[in-house]
Amino acid sequence: MKPGIHPEYREIVFVDVSNNFSFKTRSTMATKETIKWEDGNEYPLAKIETSSESHPFYTGTQKIMDTAGRVEKFRQKFGSKAVAKASGDGAAKTAEKKAAAAEAKAAEKPVKKKA
């Protein structure tokens, strides 16, 4: 390795500011703040907003989005406009044309039987 180009790998304390959970690990992160750790030594301090102690995935308090509620909000906001476009004459005519074309193709090709 070339000397002088790599960041310093050192012990650092991360503090989750949402619940004051802290842990010591090693990192190359540079900080100006320090904290006195349980062992009496002073370490660089990095403040984080989410850790394994506060993240919903790890705590089991995940919020499940109510998709039905989101659909209802959309319908209230756009209501008849969105429904009219989706079920308008154009959509019905296109569906009818596709069905007619499929029937015509099926009628043209005779079914071959294996002997």
UniProtKB/Swiss-Prot annotation:
UniProt GO cellular component terms: ribonucleoprotein complex; ribosome
GO annotation (BP), single: translation
GO MF, one example: structural constituent of ribosome
One Pfam family, short name: Ribosomal_L31
Annotated keywords: Ribonucleoprotein, Ribosomal protein
Keyword Nucleus: no
Family annotation (HAMAP family): Ribosomal_bL31_2 (MF_00502)
UniProt record similarity statement: Belongs to the bacterial ribosomal protein bL31 family. Type B subfamily.
Binding partners and assembly: Part of the 50S ribosomal subunit.
Protein name: Large ribosomal subunit protein bL31B
Organism encoding this protein: Polynucleobacter necessarius subsp. necessarius (strain STIR1)
Gene name for this UniProt entry: rpmE2
